[in-house]
Amino acid sequence: MRLLKSHPLLKLVNSYLIDASQPSNISYLWNFGSLLACCLIIQIVTGVTLAMHYSPNVLEAFNSIEHIMRDVNNGWLVRYLHSNTASAFFFLVYLHIGRGMYYGSYRAPRTLVWAIGTVILILMMATAFLGYQHSPKWFDISNKGSISNKGNITNSLPPLLQRWGGRINKRLFNKNLVKRGYCTSSSLNSPEMSERLQTIINELGINPVYVYEDLNQPSSWKQILHDTRDLSGVYMIINKTTKDYYIGSASNNRFYTRFCNHVIHFTGSKIVKLAIKKYELKNFAFVILDLYPNVVTKENNKELLDLEDKYLKLLVPNYNILTEAGSSFGYKHTEIDRQKMKDLYSDARREKIGSLNRGKKFSPETIEKIREKALTRPPMSEETKIKCIANTRPVVLYNLNRTIYGKYSTILEAANAINCNEKTIRRALQTEKKLVKRQWIVEDFSDK
């Protein structure tokens, strides 16, 4: 006790908590204030701890919760302590108010204190409940795609609509309010979406903003043009037959341009072009994964690339050659470069180059010599074959359960064994998961 009254800091604490003069008729009902302070401290400590492990992303939110519950030391205790303390906090607040009303704490000379407490209560209620305006628990997406607010907390949120056109399946949100919607009961269960595509989306664990099928119909093209006007973000082209996909980004009003380049005009990804020619356009789907909320400029274009890069690393698409996002947004040729290009490729030179072989035909003698040269060309020697094989590497194919499917001396033999292209295996070896056709895992045997 001597230390409590002699130490400078402990003396102050002692004067307020132990030796403070109190009325003789005080009771335990005056403990609510200190209990509320304890709840507030617990909320802050547990909230900061949970924020260290929580990921506020629709693709990773549930996984981060499972990580907290399973992997973090006493994470389950921290999570339940945070949620239950919040309920206890408001319970004690109402008891605190009831005590004050019973003993007339709202009368003079404590009227100002009571008014300040009322303002604090209103702010707490606004913070606690209006924050749920965009929470999944307040929204119900029915099978018809309409979204209704179950909580009916505030009328400031305009209704989120979903429009359907023909056989096109898409989800539409109010672009002036939010760029993305999320709900625990997704409208991806809609009967308008093909079962195959729904399975792929569920396996990937994504929540797309727009989904378009039947890409072989011109009405789908018009719908994409209409819905994605002035929008920017990340898109995906999905092969519903092989479950392979391509991921890319588009700046403002460029979604339809990217769609046409890849799917219609075949001036985009060569891998996507070959896949569409092999599996037909009707077996592909165009998906808008995420929307960038701001107008893309040269200054903030890096943020859009970071968004694309996040999906590239998260989903690891098979149709993408590059594993990192890149863009030439904002690049312009200088006037000097433009003039050089004009000087090098003048109209006279273009005409001259184009007329080199125009109207020319090989003579029958030349055609016969070419044919004879091709037919008499000797086959590849054994020595050359050995050199070619020496430049390849042995690989091992595993099933998804890590059992060995087969060992092959060359990548070409492995490709023939599973009926795929040699480049498919080479691309898989460069990825982290090393998945081939989502059925096998390939590893370089030469490293072992």
UniProtKB/Swiss-Prot annotation:
Family: To endonucleases of group I introns of fungi and phage.
KW Transmembrane (keyword) present: yes
NCBIfam families the record matches: grpIintron_endo
Gene: bI1
Protein name (record): Probable intron-encoded endonuclease bI1
E.C. no: 3.1.-.-
Alphabetical list of Pfam families matching this protein: Cytochrome_B, GIY-YIG, NUMOD1
Gene3D superfamilies recorded: Cytochrome Bc1 Complex, Chain C, GIY-YIG endonuclease
Region of interest (cob intron 1 encoded), ranges: 133-448
Membrane topology summary: Multi-pass membrane protein
Substitution effect: residue 221 to R: In strain: FGSC 430
Predominant place of localization: mitochondrion
GO cellular component terms, A-Z: membrane; mitochondrion; respiratory chain complex III
Lineage of the organism: Eukaryota, Fungi, Dikarya, Ascomycota, Pezizomycotina
Stretches assigned to the GIY-YIG domain: 230-321
Record field: transmembrane: 32-52, 86-106, 112-132
GO MF annotations in UniProt: DNA binding; endonuclease activity
Any one GO biological process: intron homing
PTM entry text: The mature protein may arise from proteolytic cleavage of an in-frame translation of cob exon 1 plus intron 1, containing the bI1 open reading frame.
Location(s), subcellular: Mitochondrion inner membrane
cob exon 1 encoded: annotated span: 1-132
